[in-house]
Amino acid sequence: MACFKMSSSTSSVESVEDESCSNECSASFTFDTNNNSRGNNQVNELAEETHMKLSITPTRESFSLSQLERIITIGKGTFGRVELARDKITGAHYALKVLNIRRVVDMRQTQHVHNEKRVLLQLKHPFIVKMYASEKDSNHLYMIMEFVPGGEMFSYLRASRSFSNSMARFYASEIVCALEYIHSLGIVYRDLKPENLMLSKEGHIKMADFGFAKELRDRTYTICGTPDYLAPESLARTGHNKGVDWWALGILIYEMMVGKPPFRGKTTSEIYDAIIEHKLKFPRSFNLAAKDLVKKLLEVDRTQRIGCMKNGTQDVKDHKWFEKVNWDDTLHLRVEPPIVPTLYHPGDTGNFDDYEEDTTGGPLCSQRDRDLFAEW
């Protein structure tokens, strides 16, 4: 079992968004998944029961920013940052997502931020980062979330260059469980990639960053995500649904095993062309069962894509690449992870990059901007 301690060095990856993304309706919807309602209820109940049993972070009925000591920045984005924070009373550590309201509005991300909060507050699953509470002040929005000390999977993948077949299968199996749960709630994730997959202190997956997640009753037509991981139906603007998550899983499995995504280019336009041309090539060393699954996940016809047909997620679970996976053991975290992050103390940030601290707080916002988050 490999043990790692490193700083993540992720280069910025362009996220693509149509202007209409910011104008999407904020109403909550659900859609009929391929699983029956009884099956969905069983998935949800089992996942939430497991999440509650395994939760180690003390929770409060309410939070106040004054209760938190803000320690250090552990992540930075276009319109916000993530800080490590410590509860002054319990000593528990949290990830504090800090968003500058003016920048959110200027970047036309208002609806995405609302979506992320609404979606995360619904989710209770061992492979999804937990959100505990939200706060705001005159210029910022705050999301108090679970601190995942292992850092990004991206860091470990780049350090290793690629993962073995068994390592890729381990992570893919945990992601399948998370996607099954998310889809059962009528939610599409839309941003699956190594940078959004964190490792817990034990080495298990934690899906993070739900800014592009959306509750969906049928299809949506906006282009949201990262170029390398976009499904062809997203590029064609013919409407997409949960099938984009299964496509992204195929890209992820390929990238884990090869070290780079299957459709590449020097520019975003070239990447799009490669996706549309769909020239899928595998190294000779690529596991045959994994190859078969990736091909079925990267099926251009979304109606024939594995995970999107009558049996839904069960078709993915029943694939021969996963034949040795005990799904109950996977969900209950009884399978030993291939990578265990090196951590020396609670609140250790050694698996994150170093960032310059923000001393300005960013631009001031107007009352009109604040009104967009009146219910925050």
Task: List PLM regions with ranges.
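Intrinsically disordered, low-complexity regulatory segments that flank or precede the catalytic domain
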Residues: 1-62
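Protein kinase glycine-rich loop
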Residues: 70-82
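Conserved N-lobe beta3->alphaC-helix segment of eukaryotic protein kinase catalytic domains
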Residues: 93, 98-124
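Activation-segment/catalytic-loop signature of the eukaryotic protein kinase fold
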Residues: 134
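Conserved short submotifs of the Hanks-type protein kinase catalytic core
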Residues: 139-152, 156
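Activation segment signature within eukaryotic-like protein kinase domains
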Residues: 171-172
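C-terminal regulatory tails of eukaryotic serine/threonine kinases
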Residues: 303-376
